[in-house]
Swiss-Prot record:
The keyword Metal-binding does not apply. Male-specific expression in proximal caput of the epididymis. One of its GO terms (cellular component) is extracellular region. It comes from the Eukaryota. Belongs to the pancreatic ribonuclease family. It comes from Equus caballus. This is Inactive ribonuclease-like protein 10. SMART domains: RNAse_Pc. The lineage of its organism: Eukaryota, Metazoa, Chordata, Craniata, Vertebrata. One of its GO terms (molecular function) is nucleic acid binding.
């Protein structure tokens, strides 16, 4: 069947329109990627948090360098422009902020592979009972126990912990912060966002129980 000039014209027009839409969509996607790479942690945290750390989803990590304060209580609290209290913390595979579990084992301290730092994998071993509310947020410190303890040998620095002598790490530590993607999820169907950081830590070494503020 022979094509008329009018049909050829319309086919070319449709082809050009398709190419234009494809190019526009590609530019929008590129802009979205650039925007996501500069996204702040405040977008994923509660509205009363004003933190400005770069974030990623599903284990693809951009890094920031900030300071954490470790002390003697059982709560995690980053030192950011407006304090945000996290629920728990771990050094490697061990809970550092629960006195019962503090410094009990050196197993699985180094999990530096990004796939191993994906929060759904990290949090899987915490889902012990079905039909319970998922842990809303959790922080992991990916350092060896001896490295954390060695911070106590550093010079004393000022801190806001009453009566405590504080010591600051000489380098940032690797941290993974896990945030539940949506509230109200129930075990075992917990889905987490993954945020990877590097932060200095400050420790109150009075009794080696740890809090992050």
């Amino acid at each position: 069947m022979k094509l008329t000039l009018v049909q050829i014209f319309f086919m070319m027009l449709l082809l050009l329109l398709g190419l234009g839409m494809g190019l526009g969509l590609g530019l929008q996607m590129a802009a979205a990627v650039l925007e996501d790479s500069d996204q702040s942690l405040n977008d994923f945290w509660s509205s009363d948090s004003q933190e400005k750390a770069e974030t990623t989803k599903e284990g693809d990590g951009t890094r920031t360098t900030e300071t954490l304060l470790l002390s003697n209580k059982g709560v995690v609290q980053p030192v950011w422009p407006e304090e945000t209290i996290l629920a728990e913390d771990e050094v490697g595979g061990n809970k550092m902020l629960r006195a019962d579990a503090l410094f009990q084992s050196d197993k699985d301290y180094l999990r530096l592979d990004l796939m191993n730092r994906e929060c759904n994998s990290l949090m899987a071993h915490k889902v012990k009972k079905r039909n319970h509310t998922c842990i809303p947020e959790y922080t992991f410190i990916h350092e060896e126990l001896d490295t954390v303890k060695a911070v106590c040998k550093n010079p004393v620095v000022a801190c806001d912990l009453k009566g405590a002598k504080c010591h600051k790490s000489s380098r940032p530590f690797d941290l993974t912060f896990c945030k539940l993607s949506k509230p109200g999820q129930v075990t075992p169907h917990c889905n987490y966002l993954t945020f990877i950081f590097e932060k200095f830590i400050i420790i109150s070494c009075n009794d080696m129980k740890v809090k992050i503020t």
